[in-house]
Amino acid sequence: MRFEYQKNESIPSLSWLAEISKRGGIINITHGTTVECYENFFVSGVWDGEFEKGEFDTALSFHGTGGIALEDSDFVTFVTPNHLQESLYSLVQNDEFLISNSLPFLLAYSGHQLDTNYYGYEYDLNSIFFGSKRCVKELKLKNAIVQMHRYCNLKVSCNLLWKEIPKSAKVELRTFNDYKLKMSETLHKIISNASDAKRKCQYNLVTTVSKGYDASASSALVHDLGCNTALTFSSPEKYVNDSGVEIAQLLGYKNIIEGNGCAYMNNTALWEAESASCGDVGCLVAFNTFEQVYKDSLLFLGLKGDSIWGKDESLANRNFDFIKMSIAAEQNPEHYLRNNTIAISVPLILGYEWPSIYEINNSSEMEKYSVGGEYDRPIPRRLVEEKGVPRKAFGFKKHGAGFTYRFQPTLKSVKSKMSLTSYNSLLDYSKSIKRNRLKYYAYVCKYYMKNFPTYFNYVMHRLHSPFKIKCTSKYMSSPIASLLILWGMNEMIKRYKKAI
C-alpha cells in the first residue's frame, strides 16, 4: 500500500484525512499545510526519535497522529499518541475506509452529522478519563457509527479490515533521579525532533506557569532544554494569586507574557464552538488568548499532573484510568490543529509508568518534599525547589485556570462566560434544531435528580457552609454540555465543508 497526497491550504494546518478504497492499494491523504508527508509516512506530531526515520509507532513518547505504510505491505498503520488526550476517528462507507485526526473533518467529508436527540456526547468524548480499557470506543451519529481509536496503533488492510494494537512502551523507574533523567532525556529528544531541519516547520517552545505544582514543574523541566517563553494569567482578580510571574523569573525565564483570563470573551471567531466540538465545555478556551504566542510551537502544559503526580493516587495504573471523570475535558484539538500547535502535557510523558511514579512519590527519599494535606505532590515540588524556587512560593493552594459550562442551569446563564458572537450563534442554533421534546424533558429531569447533590453543595460553598451531601459517582452528560457540543460540531463541520 502507498500514500498519495493532496494538500489543502484552507483546512487547519495540522489536520488530515485518509481515504482507502477496498482492494485499491492507494491511501489518499488530504492534509493541511504543516502535515509532514513522505513516501512511507506522514505525521502531525513530534516524538522522542530521529525525525527522518519516521518510527513514531514504536516511540516511548509520541504527541500527535500519523500513518506509516510500506509499498510491499498489504496494510497501513495509523498511530495515536502515547496518551489519551487525542484520538483518531474512523468509519466505513461505500467500500471506503475513512479516518481522520479531526472528528468534524471526518463528518464534513462523509456527509454525516451528530444526532440531536442523543444526549451522551459529553460522556462519550470525555470517557478518556476512564482509561484505555474503559473508554467509549463508538460514537453514535444520526445514521452511522464512528469508531474512536485511542492509545493504540491501528492496522488497516487493503480489504478494509482493521485491528487495534495496544501501546506497549515501557521504561524502568525506581528512584526520583531515574524519573527526572528519563523525563529530561525524553523531552530533549522530542525538542530535537521538533526542530529537525528536514521538517517543513521547526517548532518554537512555549510553556505555561502558575503558582500550582504541575505547570511549575513542567516549566522547570523544559527551561534547561531551551524553552524561554512562559505564559501566565495575572488578571482578573480570580487569577491574581495564581500568577506565575515570580515562579517563571526564579526559574530563569526571560520572556514572560501575562494575560487576562477573561480576554477570550472578546473573540469573534467562535473559539467556544471550536473547543466544544471536541467535548471541552469550558476549561481550555481561556488559553486561546495566547494563541498568537504559541502558534507554530510546542506548548508545554501541566494537565493531569493532579493524578500522575498525586501522592494519594493509590489506584495508579498503566491504562490512564483516572477512575472518575473530570468536569473539564482538558483537550482542545481543533484549536491546536488550526493554530499549528502541538500541545504536550508534561505529566503524561512516561505516564504509562504511573504505578512506578506513585511508588517514587511515596518513597522515603521524597519525605522531605512532602508538605502534607490534600494538595501534596512531592515529585513536582522537588523538581521546582531544586531549581532554586523557595518552598513558600508555590504549591500550597490549588487554583486552576479556566471554568466549565456544564453546571450552568440554563442557556441564558452561559452568556456571562461566553463571547457575545458565540452566544448569539449558540442561541440561533438552539432555536433551529429539532428535538423530541418529551425525550428531552425526561432527560433533563433525570439529570437534575441525579445531580441535585452537586448543585446543593455548590450553593453551600457559596454560603461558606461546611454542610455537604454525598454526590453520585455515576457520570451523566449535562443538557447544556450536550447542546454546546452539538452547536460546536455544527460550526466546525460548516468550517470544513467550506474548505473542502
Q: Model features per residue range: what roles?
A:
Residues N101-Y121, I128-G131, V371-R391, S425-Y429:
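Charge-dense polyanion-binding interfaces
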Residues M1-A263:
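Cysteine-centered catalytic environments shared across enzyme families
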Residues M1-N28, D428-I500:
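Membrane-proximal basic amphipathic "stem/tether" segments
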Residues C158, I165, A169-K387, R391, ...:
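ATP-dependent adenylate-handling active sites, centered on carboxylate activation for C-N bond formation
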Residues E313-S314, P333, R391-R462:
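PAPS-dependent sulfotransferase catalytic core
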Residues K142-A144, S370-G372, F396-K398:
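Short coil/turn segments at secondary-structure boundaries
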